[in-house]
């Protein structure tokens, strides 16, 4: 409505071109954790207040991280498909998570919870974050070192101009051929073309992806 004072949005784009049709707009409630889909510059310029739902999905996302990690690492979905087609699991049972080096990129609420769970699995946990925190048992290291040495790399960073495309061909090339990449953060922080190439060429062992550059829908012909 063009005369609305308050607008509630979820994870759909809410650009200036739409907001400017709402001259009475005073408050945008983002029913979502991230708010990069809202034109914050326009809101600041016009005195429009914006709030998000930080923390509502922390537990759920952290759970999903380990669902994907175990699925990819232990080949659960792959083996399910093979067995249903009459094959066997011989030679395809993946490694255990315990004892692996678990690298977390981003130490916000979700990243911090993921680190605690990884420790409970018996992993050696390392983290890269611009803002370091005092988390017992976690070593903070540079991103390149994390990528080179981790068995699991889990992304937990917001989408910003600096993080868009952060995990591209150059960064993926640093990862071990036995490593897996988990992205439950934002789709655009990973270069999908570069990731697909690395997977198809066997340069990394696997990936668990919950987010893409375009949502929704899953675009036809997408490399992943």
Where do the protein language model's features map onto the residues?
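Phosphate-binding beta-alpha-beta segment of Rossmann-like dinucleotide-binding domains, i.e.
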Residues: 46, 54-101, 113-120, 127-128
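Rossmann-like dinucleotide/phosphate-binding beta-alpha-beta segment
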Residues: 91-177
């Amino acid at each position: 409505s063009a005369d609305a004072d308050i607008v509630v949005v979820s994870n759909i784009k809410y650009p200036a071109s739409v907001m400017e049709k709402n001259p009475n707009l005073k408050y945008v409630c983002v029913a979502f954790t991230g708010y990069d889909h809202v034109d914050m510059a326009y809101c600041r310029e016009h005195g429009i207040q914006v709030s998000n739902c930080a923390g509502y999905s922390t537990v759920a996302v952290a759970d999903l991280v380990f669902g994907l990690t175990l699925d990819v690492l232990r080949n659960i979905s792959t083996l399910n498909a093979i067995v249903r087609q009459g094959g066997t699991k011989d030679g395809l049972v993946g490694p255990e998570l315990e004892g692996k080096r678990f690298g977390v990129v981003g130490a916000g609420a979700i990243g911090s919870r993921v680190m605690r769970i990884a420790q409970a699995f018996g992993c050696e946990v390392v983290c890269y974050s611009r803002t370091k925190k005092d988390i017992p048992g976690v070593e903070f290291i540079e991103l390149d070192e994390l990528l080179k040495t981790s068995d699991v790399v889990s992304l937990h960073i917001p989408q910003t101009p600096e993080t868009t495309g952060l995990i591209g061909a150059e960064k993926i090339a640093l990862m071990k051929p036995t490593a897996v990449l988990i992205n439950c953060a934002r789709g655009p922080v990973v270069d999908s073309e570069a990731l697909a190439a690395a997977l198809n060429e066997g340069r990394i062992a696997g990936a668990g992806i919950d987010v893409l550059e375009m949502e929704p829908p899953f675009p036809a012909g997408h490399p992943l």
